[in-house]
Amino acid sequence: MECPNCHQNASRVIDSRPSDENRAIRRRRECENCGFRFTTFERIETAPLLVVKNDGTREPFSRKKILHGVMAAGQKRPISSEQFEHLVDQVENKVRKQGVSEISSKKIGQYVMDDLADLDDVAYIRFASIYREFKDMSSFMKTMEDMMAKKEKGN
């Protein structure tokens, strides 16, 4: 592995441990030439996944895009960054378990909404208001009533 400090190819692994819920290996390395220590990650290479948008266009799947959306919905809510990351992990796992090369943005949005509903009611409503593109107050109220009924049923 090339040292990012002196660019020599002589390094050794001094520590190795699982990372990212056992989906990656984190390795601490030390350059045998200059002694510089650095970290590398080894991950399973996954097949490219395309998201089919509502207008039919396709774009690469992006964890960052999902994370940005849920963080915006959960702004000023008592949700930690670890909870946001965990939610995105759950959504990505559901998507990858489908075993397909393309998935609709609607399906991804539904996965996000399902997990947000369990995490925070306000974040769920905020996300739903954009994702579902409410046309009027009655469709918004229907979503709120459905969510409240689901919560009552669960208790």
UniProtKB/Swiss-Prot annotation:
Family annotation (Pfam families): ATP-cone, Zn_ribbon_NrdR
Source species of the chain: Lactobacillus acidophilus (strain ATCC 700396 / NCK56 / N2 / NCFM)
Region annotation (Disordered) ranges: 1-22
Entry's Gene Ontology molecular function annotations: ATP binding; DNA binding; zinc ion binding
Swiss-Prot/TrEMBL keywords: ATP-binding, DNA-binding, Metal-binding, Nucleotide-binding, Repressor, Transcription, Transcription regulation, Zinc, Zinc-finger
Superkingdom assignment: Bacteria
Function according to Swiss-Prot or TrEMBL: Negatively regulates transcription of bacterial ribonucleotide reductase nrd genes and operons by binding to NrdR-boxes.
Cited InterPro entries: ATP-cone_dom, NrdR-like_N, RNR_NrdR-like
Family, as annotated: Belongs to the NrdR family.
Zinc finger (unnamed): 3-34
Keyword DNA-binding: yes
Name of this chain's protein: Transcriptional repressor NrdR
Textual note on the cofactor: Binds 1 zinc ion.
Cofactor list: Zn(2+)
GO BP terms in the entry: negative regulation of DNA-templated transcription
Domain ATP-cone span(s) in chain numbering: 49-139
Compositional bias segments (type: Polar residues): 1-11
